[in-house]
Design a protein with these regions (language model features):
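Beta-strand elements within well-structured catalytic alpha/beta cores of enzymes
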Residues: 8, 48-54, 142, 168-176
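Catalytic metal-binding/acid-base residues of hydrolase active sites
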Residues: 56-58, 178-179
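Short gly/pro-enriched beta-turn/loop segments at secondary-structure junctions
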Residues: 134-137, 165-169, 175-176, 257
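Short, catalytically relevant binding-site loops at active-site mouths
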Residues: 147-149, 178-181
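Short conserved catalytic/interaction loops centered on acidic-Pro-aromatic/His motifs
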Residues: 170, 181-185
């Protein structure tokens, strides 16, 4: 089977990494345990390529960003981790196919072609848990835009179509956190719409109610102070037309920020 063979949602708090958390990772133990389960699920899929969407990538308002350079590097040293930078190969063939398919679909993209492109923590924190499951597999970092939500879903379809055309087995990892306004202790204070947003999104993803996600009120999204919605919609678009088992492996909201881990397994032979 080629095309999208697995999808997942992963949060990216740096303190999930023990060398950064230095004991504080116990406050997100539920999330850490779920990430280990996610790694086990991903390892079973044997992808050829992993597409990783990060809210903290080098973004532009009016175009999706796609790394087209042959390699990229990443570390978490700015967060206190002393591990050396990791080097990852990029699947430039599939990246080119995604850009071509996007152009055909009328979705603007831009090439990120820096030979020294540095992966952000939105990529590196999930990879701390998932890298062993995709060892030696090239990755394609993606940056979303501020184009409409529907455009992000449609861009996900583009990724799925390109994966099929290239006959690649592709796993897609959507990095993102939910509301940052769950409590007064959060980074942006409390807004009652924060918990409302998180409950609705977790429920919608459990049921794969994509229409409800796409029609979320702009005010709700803004007041929630979230960062992952567009990443998630690209993932959901990539799964369009497939029979999918959606499982929310965990959700918790310590530090006033919502963290969710979810898997999207393709049902085969049905």
């Amino acid at each position: 089977m080629s095309g999208i063979i697995f999808g997942c949602i992963a949060p990216h708090p740096p303190l999930l990494v023990p060398s950064i958390g230095r004991g504080q990772e116990s406050a997100v133990q539920i999330t850490g345990d779920a990430m280990k389960k996610l790694a086990n699920l991903l390892e079973l899929q044997h992808p050829d390529t992993a597409v990783i969407i990060s809210p903290h990538a080098e973004s532009a308002a009016d175009a999706m960003g796609i790394l087209t350079a042959p390699r990229c590097t990443g570390d978490l040293q700015r967060w206190g981790d002393r591990s050396p930078a990791r080097i990852f190969a990029n699947d430039i063939e599939l990246a080119s196919a995604i850009r071509k398919e996007a152009k055909t679909s009328g979705i603007p993209t831009r090439s990120i072609d820096s030979d020294n492109y540095e992966l952000d923590h939105g990529v590196m924190v999930p990879l701390h848990f998932l890298e062993r499951s995709i060892e030696g597999v090239p990755i394609i970092p993606i940056a979303f835009s501020w184009l409409p939500l529907q455009t992000h879903y449609d861009f996900g379809k583009v990724i799925g179509n390109a994966a099929k055309q290239q006959q690649k087995r592709v796993a897609i990892i959507a990095s993102g956190d939910l509301s940052h306004k769950l409590s007064a202790q959060g980074p942006y204070g409390y807004d009652p719409m924060g918990p409302v947003f998180d409950k609705r999104l977790v429920d919608d993803l459990s049921k794969l109610d994509i229409e409800d996600i796409l029609t979320m009120d702009d005010v709700l999204i803004e007041r929630a102070g979230q960062c992952g919605l567009r990443s998630f919609l690209i993932l959901l678009g990539a799964l369009d037309g497939l029979k999918v088992k959606s499982t929310v492996l965990s959700y918790e909201g310590p530090f006033g920020v919502g963290y969710m881990v979810a898997s999207f397994e393709i049902k085969r032979g049905e």
